[in-house]
Amino acid sequence: IDAPDFNLGVERWLKQGGVRTVHDVSPSVWAWRENRAAKIAASADRVLCLFPMEPPIYARHGVDAVFIGHPLADAIPLQPDRDGARIALGEAVDAPLLALLPGSRLGEITRMLPTFLQAARLLQADVPGLRVMVPAANAQCRAAIEALVGDLPALRVLDGQAQAAMIASDVVLLASGTAALEAMLCKRPMVIGHRISGLTYAIVKAFGLLKSAHVSLPNVLAGETLVPELLQDDCTPANLHAALRHWFRDADAVAALQPT
């Protein structure tokens, strides 16, 4: 699981021995290193894809690929119960609520959470009574989060419960990844804030490794900017605050995100 180089090696060995192979699921060739699609052809007879934009990429490389859908689409109710999620979390149904999801790895937390917390502090000055929730994926993450939160008022660290926090929240501030897809399925307005190391970013830019105009799945799937993406130097407390404030103040913009 989540070891594509190892798995593809095993698949290639099996395929060379005459065993038909299926690769489940496709790596993110839509985002970067599209050339991996051609390499997968040597290992897999068929690739199962979570997203509809992936099979056409494989078709360009002569690979049989099928869109099967994402399991999160079945795991999250079509109409999430916001009030029920708030009651389950012990939150008032009428209080403004912001969820922060800086990532589930310690490096992501230490890199992104301080900026997210500064943005939340600025937002509390604009949104009276704003409460903040930060789900922690495990005990290590909780310790890292608690070491950073300082004296930010009205903040709770949760043990897991990320999906419940998203459903309960008015707005989600997150660092992209699968969490953005989850927030979309929870029908929550969101702001994407993300930074990678300067060296990694320079390499990605220099070699043109990033193929998509967007990095978050809601925007990639829509083919347009539905939610703001603030990346690298644009990912500042002031910019995040402005984007979050927009969602809290513009009910029409929030309503436009909801399916009819």
Regions found by a protein language model. Give the residues of each.
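Nucleotide-activated sugar donor-binding and catalytic core shared by glycosyltransferases
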Residues: I1-T260
